[in-house]
Amino acid sequence: LNNKNIAKNLNFTTAQGKGVFYSFIYNDIFYKCFFVFEENKIQFCKQIKSSEYKKLISESGEFLTINKFKSFPINLGVFNNELELEYLKETKLTYNLNKPKTYVFNFGKIDGKSLNFLFENEDSRLIIKGEFNKVNFDFKNNVLNTKKISSSRYDKNLLTGCVNYFDTKFANVTINSNDMFCEDSVNIKNSLGSIKKIKVENSFFDALDLDFSKLDIDNIIVNGANNDCIDVSFGDYLIKKATLSNCGDKGISIGEKSKLNLEEGTIFFSNIGIASKDSAITKVQKLQIQQSNICLSAYKKKREFSGSKIFVENLDCKKYKIKTKVDKFSKIEIK
């Protein structure tokens, strides 16, 4: 970035020659650059907005054709000012997360406890690992200064969630989240087991994100998410009941080869009720949707996947603009 021969013009957007785009974060600033193979040099680097950086991250794995040359954009991650990890050293009932750190909660197996986590710094993140049986988790945002919230969606360790469960085993667990400000209020990855109830209220962005997991969930309640209420990918999910309201974009988004079985769903006030994409298979027994622009949508988004399928046995959709939207690769079947 200190090389004066590298163009830094924000209007410089045309890539010339055969090369690859790459992105990174440097000192809290987002960058997108283009490297030309034939000349073995960086043609240009430019600052980009966080929304464009997020789009680059979400489209990882998709190839681009530039000047008749196919390449995959690369994300280099974050340089400088990485958040420090702090391992919580003792088990207690309430934790105050008041420093700009990523806190790690990993105490092995825990039974029958109620654990409370208070977020008191906009840069605090939480990683949870372990085995939990009949444990109640409660997460609350106590941050008073919300000026930095718009830039807090991704932390410097590229954690998307305020709360991040990794490699976790659940048994009859409940999760409650209020007023979270990250890209995902609650993110669960590489985990399995049964969850009794998840309740998420007032998310600045996505409410609940499930990835690479196999989960049985009795009840999900989401009220207020500026983006998706539920987002699942690369996994196998059974949800017995979901009650979702005031979802800024999608009520439920299912993608990337996921299998979702929803027994009963109620979705009020969303842009799209259920969106299934990219080789995902979605099966719903009973579904009620009200005040959505689109009730059901099935499509292929990424080149490396095929279309998607939605099967609904009983659909009651009211006050909508489009009932079903499906592309040529996908299928929606309503009995």
Locate the predicted segments by residue.
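Extracellular beta-rich repeat passengers
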Residues: N2-K335
